[in-house]
Amino acid sequence: MPSHCRERLPFALHFFAVAYGASLWILGSHGLAAANPACSARDDLSANMTISWTEIRAGCDAERTAYREQNPVGSSWFANAGNGFTGAPYLLQRVLPDLAPEIWGRNDENFGRFGFFPDPDDKSRPLPLGLGIASTAGRPLDAGGNPLGEIDFAKPGLDVVTLACGPHWTGTDAGWTGGRRGCAEHEDGRAQVAGCLLANGDSLLLHP
């Protein structure tokens, strides 16, 4: 090793040690919030036999609630953003209950007979969880390219309705009690839209 490298080696090692220690301190002090102990117990149930499923679920619910409060736009996007930018025209979707309530249900049902339920976090949302609204104008974004919301109705474009994935995973207790023709109620509030429509689509449309 050249002499000038040997002279600099102790300084480099000292600098690396200081930087490494500082990074650990920063991560520990300002990093992500620690996981809820009760929720973390599900990773090794055999080592956490004294924790009940109710406690685990409550801990995970607390984690999810905290995350949603810290990331409201992202959480809403995940639950309601439509899958793509093609689908049924939004205006047509809204008037279906007026055109044929015997098939689509009344307006106040908000397509509940098909397994959908209102968004418990946004009562004013015109469509239920499971149906996303998109526009040919694209998503509303800020200057940094981050989503500002689901849709900007003030922006010119064709607004369309398509399915959204979020309700299957959010586990929100929506209190839906439809139970129509096999569209059973689920304790964790999942819409189960696809399975419900596949199993009961004909009877729902032909024999409402």
From Swiss-Prot:
It comes from the Bacteria. This is Uncharacterized protein y4iN. Keywords: Plasmid, Signal. Residues 1-34 form the signal peptide.
